[in-house]
């Protein structure tokens, strides 16, 4: 089984990114052929600073490796180094409807936030995302709940292409974590945790100091009542139960049993302690890795070579199926 996912090199990684994506990436190394991409091209679809983007690619690579990605057990590369992605994106536009792209929630939300220019790249984002995955004929795409509609679109694109030009692509499945699919802001649990749209005190960053993490959980908003139980009217406590369940690798019901009869304050302190201890090794290892950009660049370049070897074969099949470029010559067999 081939597993593929991409991660944005924008902003500091928070607990939602870590539980919803990075933990899945690490586990994927034991489940199949894992291919992970730092999507710098996607990051250019909104306003950005070029020098900052380059630095954040290294930040992201370091945090992924610190979390447990092993370049010897997976392919880790920078999207912009594998040009097959962009050519495949263009070819896939022939089987993608404008209406589908206009309906994407991410396009509508981000286009409102753009002050000067809503780029065509922002509209085309899901097509490039489809190219990212389909180039490797991936079977599974680990994503958060907010990316479900993009995976559904890439599935539709793959099916449409196969029907029009012949069986070429694998139709991928999404893999959304059962626990922690949407980590909420600790101060405003009605919305998801976010580096850009969330509150500073409600956003736990992976590289936060342990004391800062504990402090944020102690100050987290709770709900009416006194029982450590999930419920639709208890978004704050539900969020923290699901966070601790993800940290422990257990079902939320197990957390509820462990804290039966305890006060909210004790529960919040316990969650803060466990999250801080869980992230501490990642923070320490990140510090060791981030100081050697040459080593990180070497890992990304080696990963790009491996990725290109796969994607180029897929692109050749796509071009042949679509009639783009010269016809393939038959294999020359020895007399």
Give the positions of each predicted feature:
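Conserved nucleotide- and phosphate/pyrophosphate-binding catalytic cores
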Residues: 149, 155-335
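Short helix-capping/linker segments at secondary-structure and domain boundaries
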Residues: 98-102, 135-142, 245-255, 283
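A generic secondary-structure signal for well-formed alpha-helical elements
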Residues: 61, 68, 96-100, 138, ...
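Internal, conserved structured core segments that host functional sites
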Residues: 109-161, 165, 185
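Short, histidine-centered active-site or binding-site loop motifs used for metal coordination
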Residues: 7-9, 40-42, 139-140, 197, ...
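N-terminal Rossmann-like or analogous alpha/beta NTP/dinucleotide-binding catalytic cores
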Residues: 2-131, 274-277, 287
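Short catalytic-loop micro-motif centered on adjacent basic/acidic residues
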Residues: 75-78, 142, 225
